[in-house]
Amino acid sequence: MPTHDEICVTQKKKRIAGVQITVVHHRSFEGSSVVEDTEDWFAQDVFGNVWYFGEDTIELPSRSTEGSWQAGVNDADAGFIMLADPHVGDRYYQEFARNVAEDQAKVLSLDESVTVQGMTYNNVLLTQETSRLDPGIVEHKYYAPGVGFVLGVMVKGGDERTELVRQSTCSE
């Protein structure tokens, strides 16, 4: 069954741990059915770093909320989702809620070129993402300047490939 994700940066704001964040609505589909519905919470600091403050997620049809977390609750900490000035070798937590969400990234390259859906992107940031909670999974993610995420490739623990298909304005 074909799968796809839809991600929308909303106009909604929320305050978490004293910081005003932006709500990003992320839905995952199998065919035409929503299988995961998530609100992700992000904020950008004065230096340009983008922080991840948590997520409120629900899997359907089970209605499981496993993986939901919020910075400042149960000792969870916000993590970096994107560094303003990344350097090869930088390592950082993207999210840290012990035994719930412990994703980490390592910067592998700042000058990749990738072609996705017939569009070539240059000076692409390449990260390697891992988690202590899923030690058998390693994913490479590619971020293009002025665009953001364009490609994800599972390099250990699966063969998934996620590509940016289109960018558009969301209706939320």
What are these regions (language model features)?
Residues 1-172:
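Conserved functional acidic sites
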